[in-house]
A protein has these predicted regions:
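Short catalytic micro-motifs in class I SAM-dependent methyltransferases
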Residues: 111-112
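Helix-capping/helix-break motifs at membrane-protein junctions
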Residues: 117-118
């Protein structure tokens, strides 16, 4: 999709659906190449933290975003991923987010949990709960598996091909 447009649309969603304020402390789980961070640079006054498993994306964000916006920090998650970070040392289902408990008023993950197996999703949700302040908000995106999407999968009409048995999810 359109990189800039989608980032701006999500900023609007963060503000309207999750009541994002400029004063919020934000964690971007799976920050990628900054699609969500870039529009936040014009809005967020407080701390932003992002992490990702793709070294090139983290390096780009550090070079082009953090250098201009010192309240925006990006770090590489040393999570093993065959496609994105094969040298990673930690499995996603055991990864501990590198932040203190109750650190963030808003946490989001867009197009992240759809890349994880159920035990890793459980871990990520537990980690989000740990780092989220008691009155914090969270926005996560998922694939919707309902009767219609299951029918499309079975008929071969789905846009995404699920390689794993989705009956156990």
């Amino acid at each position: 999709g359109d990189f800039v447009r989608i980032g701006r649309e999500f900023l609007d969603i963060f503000k309207t659906e999750a009541s994002l304020l400029p004063s919020d402390t934000v964690l971007d789980v799976g920050s990628g190449i900054g699609r969500m961070a870039i529009p936040l640079t014009d809005y967020l006054e407080n701390r932003y933290e992002g992490f990702d498993v793709v070294p090139e994306g983290v390096n780009w964000c550090q070079k082009y975003i953090s250098s201009r916006f010192p309240n925006f920090n990006f770090q590489l998650a040393d999570i093993h991923n065959r496609s994105y970070h094969p040298s990673g040392k930690v499995r996603a289902n055991a990864y501990v987010f590198p932040y203190e408990q109750d650190s963030f008023s808003f946490v989001f993950a867009t197009s992240v949990l759809t890349h994880l197996l159920p035990d890793a999703v459980d871990n990520y949700i537990s980690q989000i709960a740990r780092v989220l302040k008691p009155d914090g908000r969270c926005l996560l995106t998922f694939f919707l598996l309902n009767d219609r999407s299951r029918e499309n999968l079975e008929c071969g009409h789905a846009q995404a091909d699920f390689k794993f048995d989705n009956g156990t999810y």
